[in-house]
C-alpha cells in the first residue's frame, strides 16, 4: 500500500532550498522516535515499511512531504495503517527540537547533504541540460528555479530561519494526501484526520499556481552554449505550447508528444536516431503545468547544426500532418498504454493524481486513456500549430 502527504507552496528562489531541505530534516526524528535508529526499529515492526522524504516540482509549485510504502492491511490480515499514519504525522508535526527550534546539528548535516544533491545534478547530463535550458528559457519566471533550489541559497540555510519556514509551511500550505490500498476510503479519512488533528492551520495560501506564458520571450529563438568536459554533447530545445494552453486538452497533448518524440515509434526517434544516426539518444518531454515541450538529445558536437535542423523539421511535419495513420495509431497506443500503466503501481498512481489535482482535474488514468484513444489527426495538427521555439541550449 502507499501513502503520500504533500505540502504545496509557491516555488520561489528565496524559499526553494529552505523548503527542499525540510522533509529531510523532519525525517531524522520526532519526539516519540528521536533518531534514525528508533525510526528504523519502528518501521521494522511494520513489516519493513519505508517512509521517504520527497521534493517535487509541479510547474511553479513546490511540493514537499513524505511517501510511505508498506504492506497492505488486507494482505496481512492485521491493521498496520493506523500506526504507520501516526508515524508519518509525528515526523511531520512533532519534530526533534531544542528550545523550540529545529536542532542545529541536524539542520547543518542535512544542509550539507542538500548541497551535495544540488551539485550531483550535473552527473545526469540529460536532465542537467533540460534544467539549464529552463534556467535560460524561463529566466524571468519562477519556473527557472530548480526543484531543490540554488546552491548559494542552500549554503545560507540556518536553523532559526528554517524553523520559521517550517511553521509557515504547516499553517499556510494546501495539503494533498493520497492513499492507495484496500482500506475503505472513509475509514482512511477518519484515521488521517485523527492523526493530523494537531496540525496548526492559519489562512491558507490561495495564490499558489503556475503562470503560463503563451509566446516566446523574444521574436527569434535564443541560443545558449555552455562548455563542460563531456564525451557526448547535449542539445536541449525548448518550445512554448502557445495558444492551445488557453484551454489545454491533455489527451491531445499526450498524443502530440508521443508522436513527436515521446516513444520509440516517434518522429524524432525513428528519424534522428534510426534513419540519420545524428544522436545517441533523443526524446521529447511535456510539461502540461507550464505549457512547455522540450526535446533533449545526446549528440556528437559536430552534428549540432544537422540535429537542430532535423528536430525542427520533424515538428514541422507534425504541424502539417505529414505523418501516416500508422504513426498516429502507434502514438495513441503508446500514450494510452502509459496512462493505463500508471494505475498498476501505487507510487505512479499517486504521482498521476497529484499532478491532476494541482491542475484541478478529476479524471482517472483509464478515463484519460479512453479520451486519448479518441484523438484525431486534426486535433494533433491544431495543437501543434501554435507551438513556438523559445530557446536552444
Language model feature labels by segment:
Residues 105, 207-220, 326-337:
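Short proline/glycine- and acidic-rich turn/helix-capping motifs at secondary-structure junctions
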Residues 115-120, 218-232, 337-346:
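Short, low-order "capping/linker" segments at domain edges
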Residues 29-32, 73-77, 94-103:
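Short, polar/flexible loop-turn hinges at active-site or ligand-entry regions and domain interfaces
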Residues 19-27:
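Active-site SXXK
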Residues 159-195, 392-393:
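Non-catalytic, conformational "gating/processing" segments within enzyme and secreted inhibitor domains
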Residues 1-19, 36-90, 117, 126-152, ...:
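M16 family metallopeptidases and their MPP-like homologs
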Residues 1-18, 167, 174, 193, ...:
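His/Glu-based metal-binding/catalytic segments typifying zinc-dependent metallopeptidases
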Residues 381-393:
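Bilobed periplasmic-binding protein-like "clamshell/Venus-flytrap" ligand-binding domains
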Amino acid at each position: 500500500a502507499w501513502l503520500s502527504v504533500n505540502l504545496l507552496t509557491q516555488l520561489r528562489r528565496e524559499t526553494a532550498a529552505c523548503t527542499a531541505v525540510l522533509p529531510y530534516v523532519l525525517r531524522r526524528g520526532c519526539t516519540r522516535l528521536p533518531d534514525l535508529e528508533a525510526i528504523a526499529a519502528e518501521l521494522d515492526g511494520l513489516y519493513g515499511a519505508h517512509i521517504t522524504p520527497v521534493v517535487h516540482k509541479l510547474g511553479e509549485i513546490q511540493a514537499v512531504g513524505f511517501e510511505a510504502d508498506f504492506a497492505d492491511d488486507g494482505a496481512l490480515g492485521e491493521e498496520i495503517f493506523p500506526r504507520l499514519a501516526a508515524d508519518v504525522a509525528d515526523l511531520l508535526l512533532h519534530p526533534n527540537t531544542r528550545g523550540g527550534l529545529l536542532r542545529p546539528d541536524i539542520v547543518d548535516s542535512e544542509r550539507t547533504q542538500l548541497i551535495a544533491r544540488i551539485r550531483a545534478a550535473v552527473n545526469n547530463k540529460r536532465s542537467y541540460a533540460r534544467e539549464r535550458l529552463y534556467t535560460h528559457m524561463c529566466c524571468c519566471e519562477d519556473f527557472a528555479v530548480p526543484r531543490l533550489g540554488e546552491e548559494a541559497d542552500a549554503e545560507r540555510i540556518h536553523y532559526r530561519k528554517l524553523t520559521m519556514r517550517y511553521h509557515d509551511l504547516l499553517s499556510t500550505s494546501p495539503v494533498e494526501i493520497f492513499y492507495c490500498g484496500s482500506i475503505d476510503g472513509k475509514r482512511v479519512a477518519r484515521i488521517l484526520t485523527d492523526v493530523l488533528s494537531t496540525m496548526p492551520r492559519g489562512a491558507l495560501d490561495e495564490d499558489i499556481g503556475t503562470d503560463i506564458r503563451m509566446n516566446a520571450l523574444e521574436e527569434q529563438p535564443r541560443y545558449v552554449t555552455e562548455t563542460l568536459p563531456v564525451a557526448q554533447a547535449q542539445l536541449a530545445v525548448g518550445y512554448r505550447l502557445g495558444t492551445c494552453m488557453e484551454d489545454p486538452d491533455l489527451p491531445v497533448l499526450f498524443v502530440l508528444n508521443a508522436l513527436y518524440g515521446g516513444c520509440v515509434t516517434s518522429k524524432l526517434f525513428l528519424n534522428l536516431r534510426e534513419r540519420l544516426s545524428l544522436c545517441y539518444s533523443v526524446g521529447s518531454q511535456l510539461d502540461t503545468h507550464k505549457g512547455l515541450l522540450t526535446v533533449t538529445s545526446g549528440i556528437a558536437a559536430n552534428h549540432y547544426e544537422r540535429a537542430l535542423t532535423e528536430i525542427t523539421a520533424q515538428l514541422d511535419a507534425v504541424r502539417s500532418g505529414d505523418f501516416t495513420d500508422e504513426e498516429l495509431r502507434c502514438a495513441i497506443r503508446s500514450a494510452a498504454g502509459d496512462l493505463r500503466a500508471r494505475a498498476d503501481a501505487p507510487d505512479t498512481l499517486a504521482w498521476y493524481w497529484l499532478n491532476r489535482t494541482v491542475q484541478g482535474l478529476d479524471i482517472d488514468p483509464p478515463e484519460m486513456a479512453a479520451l486519448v484513444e479518441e484523438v484525431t489527426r486534426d486535433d494533433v495538427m491544431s495543437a501543434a500549430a501554435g507551438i513556438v521555439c523559445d530557446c536552444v541550449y
